[in-house]
């Protein structure tokens, strides 16, 4: 088994010419390169940058790199087509690159110019670069949240991530255990990666619960899009007087009666509820599929909801209808614009 010093000596012997050229270029230009978690980075932001980071779509993926190529050959090349905000070269422990890098420009136009100009660029004989739009991961899932957690409490727990957190959804977990899953959308991949690292290094606990933190998988994203695809409540937005009367009804007779009154005031007709119990969990939790048909609206509202029954004599279907009514009323009274899909709040679980 090699000692640490022997490993260091072996790494020093790998690609010495290009390493020396890189060091000379760094001294000459004064450029600052930082090694972070298996990648070497320039910028993010670069010197003299003022303002917010570039928008999504401003980063390109660079593939088919010879492993002995370094920044002194790549950064000047990619700076020719636009101003670089950040350049990241993926590295091995030996000091060779891993065959790919990422270049983020100050605008989407710079990224488009890089693709148009440098894709298939011949860096060396028989070595053509692959340059394409980077698929930036900006979305996380936090699974295993308690059923009692509401959206406001979740947002309070996520406050440390600040304005980089653009969207938060709280939905029924697709797993078999009765729990919730949060979908978090960040402004940049870097912000999402830092949030993931913080959550994982915090022993993956959020709101006092053990949770699983992962990148949002494409199939799961599609699943939620299909589940949430539905009518937007903004087309049913009531006026202030109608909401005031509805809240009075809510306090005296319950959510379903309040929703019935609101629909009548808006001349939409009486809502019709369809529910189906999909299974049960521990501590009296029941999972329901629901659909609410409002005659004056062209498309029904549907989704999943967990409810808990206070006693054996309670009718789970009636409890589910009341819970869904409360959600529809909340969505009507608190306008939201979702980056995921219209009607996203329809999946939030409640406890009765």
Curated annotation (Swiss-Prot):
Isoform 1 and isoform 2 are expressed in testis. Isoform 1 is expressed continuously in post natal (PN) testis although levels are low between PN1 to PN6. Isoform 2 is expressed from PN 20 onwards. Isoform 2 is strongly expressed in meiotic and in post-meiotic germ cells of the testis with highest expression at the elongated spermatid stage (at protein level). Expressed in testis and heart. Expressed in germ cells and genital ridges. Not detected in testicular tumors. One of its GO terms (molecular function) is mRNA 3'-UTR binding. The modification Omega-N-methylarginine is found at residue 336. InterPro entries: DND1_DSRM, DND1_RRM1, Nucleotide-bd_a/b_plait_sf, RBD_domain_sf, RRM_dom. CDD domains: DSRM_DND1, RRM1_DND1. GO terms for biological process: 3'-UTR-mediated mRNA destabilization; germ cell development; negative regulation of miRNA-mediated gene silencing; spermatogenesis. Residues 58-136, 138-218 form the RRM domain. Its main location: nucleus. One of its GO terms (cellular component) is cytoplasm. The keyword Nucleus applies. Pfam families: DND1_DSRM, RRM_1. It is found in: Nucleus; Cytoplasm. Keywords: Cytoplasm, Developmental protein, Methylation, Nucleus, Repeat, RNA-binding. It is linked to Defects in Dnd1 are the cause of the Ter mutation phenotype. Ter mice are characterized by primordial germ cell loss and susceptibility to spontaneous testicular germ cell tumors (TGCT). They are sterile, but viable. Isoform 1 defects may be the cause of tumor development. Interacts with APOBEC3. RNA-binding factor that positively regulates gene expression by prohibiting miRNA-mediated gene suppression. Relieves miRNA repression in germline cells. Prohibits the function of several miRNAs by blocking the accessibility of target mRNAs. Sequence-specific RNA-binding factor that binds specifically to U-rich regions (URRs) in the 3' untranslated region (3'-UTR) of several mRNAs. Does not bind to miRNAs. Isoform 1 may play a role during primordial germ cell (PGC) survival. However, does not seem to be essential for PGC migration. This is Dead end protein homolog 1. The lineage of its organism: Eukaryota, Metazoa, Chordata, Craniata, Vertebrata. The gene is Dnd1.
């Amino acid at each position: 088994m090699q000692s640490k010093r022997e490993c260091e000596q072996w790494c020093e012997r790998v690609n010495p010419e290009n390493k020396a050229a890189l060091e000379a270029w760094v001294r000459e230009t004064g450029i600052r390169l930082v090694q972070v978690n298996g990648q070497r980075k320039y910028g993010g932001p670069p010197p003299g940058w003022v303002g917010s980071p570039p928008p999504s779509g401003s980063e390109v993926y660079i593939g088919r790199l010879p492993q002995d190529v370094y920044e002194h050959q790549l950064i000047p090349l990619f700076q020719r087509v636009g101003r670089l905000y950040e350049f990241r070269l993926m590295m091995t422990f030996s000091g060779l690159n891993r065959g790919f890098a990422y270049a983020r420009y100050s605008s989407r136009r710079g990224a488009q110019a890089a693709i148009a100009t440098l894709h298939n660029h011949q860096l060396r004989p028989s070595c053509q670069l692959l340059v394409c739009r980077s698929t930036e991961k900006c979305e996380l899932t936090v699974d295993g949240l308690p059923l009692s957690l509401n959206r406001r409490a979740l947002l309070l727990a996520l406050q440390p991530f600040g304005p980089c957190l653009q969207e938060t959804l709280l939905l029924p977990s697709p797993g078999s255990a009765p729990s919730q899953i949060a979908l978090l959308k960040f402004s940049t991949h870097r912000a999402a990666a830092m949030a993931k690292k913080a959550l994982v290094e915090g022993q993956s606990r959020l709101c006092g619960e053990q949770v699983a933190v992962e990148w949002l998988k494409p199939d799961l994203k599609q699943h939620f899009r299909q589940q949430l695809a539905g009518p937007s409540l903004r087309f049913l937005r009531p006026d202030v007087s109608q909401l005031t009367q509805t809240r009075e009804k809510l306090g005296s007779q319950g959510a379903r009666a309040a929703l019935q009154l609101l629909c009548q005031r808006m001349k939409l007709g009486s809502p019709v509820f369809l529910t189906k119990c999909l299974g049960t969990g521990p501590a009296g939790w029941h999972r329901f599929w629901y659909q609410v048909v409002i005659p004056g609206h062209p498309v029904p509202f549907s989704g999943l909801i967990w409810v808990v029954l206070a006693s054996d004599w309670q009718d789970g279907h009636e409890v589910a209808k009341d819970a869904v009514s409360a959600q529809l009323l909340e969505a009507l009274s608190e306008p939201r614009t979702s980056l995921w899909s219209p009607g996203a709040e329809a999946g939030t679980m409640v406890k009765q």
